[in-house]
């Protein structure tokens, strides 16, 4: 089931965030990316949150800031289902473009985004921090709705 994120979800979202990302967001960052200008969704399976999406909207554009799936549920199609639901809801709100940034090394995510119609726009050099203190490039992608 895909639903809007509520405050009671944040402990579970934080668990997923810590497990799913190389350099995860803090709980504070998760909490700060909420409110009227966001469309944030969770994917629940048998009353267990297994994935979430954090998306900010501004006028007729949106930016997908975070998409995370519990590692135990990765590679099973949940990210694509959640992303498709997000895209459909954004279209219903009159959003014309969905933007995102993804680590250049995250080819699995890039394939997911390609599969729903995203286009690579450019590379942002040295954007993402790495655990060793170095930086990694970001691939900027856009989906025209």
Curated annotation (Swiss-Prot):
Short name of any one Pfam family annotated for the protein: Acetyltransf_1
List of catalytic residues: 101, 113
One GO CC term, this protein: cytoplasm
Keyword line: Acyltransferase, Cytoplasm, Transferase
Cleaved signal peptide residues: none
Protein family membership: Belongs to the acetyltransferase family. RimI subfamily.
Annotated function: Acetylates the N-terminal alanine of ribosomal protein bS18.
UniProt-recorded name of the protein: [Ribosomal protein bS18]-alanine N-acetyltransferase
Origin species: Haemophilus ducreyi (strain 35000HP / ATCC 700724)
């Amino acid at each position: 089931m895909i639903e809007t994120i509520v405050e009671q979800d944040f402990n579970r979202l934080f668990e997923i965030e810590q497990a799913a990302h190389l350099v995860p967001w803090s709980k504070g960052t998760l909490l700060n990316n909420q409110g009227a200008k966001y469309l944030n969704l969770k994917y629940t399976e048998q009353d267990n949150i297994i994935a979430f999406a954090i998306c900010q909207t501004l006028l007729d554009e949106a930016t997908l800031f975070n998409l995370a799936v519990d590692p135990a549920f990765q590679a099973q199609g949940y990210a694509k289902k959640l992303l498709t639901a997000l895209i459909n809801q954004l279209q219903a709100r009159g959003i014309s473009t969905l933007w995102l940034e993804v680590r250049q090394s995250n080819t699995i995510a890039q394939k997911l985004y390609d599969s729903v119609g995203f286009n690579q726009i450019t590379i942002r050099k040295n954007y993402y921090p790495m655990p060793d203190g170095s930086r990694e490039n970001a691939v900027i992608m856009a989906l025209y709705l």
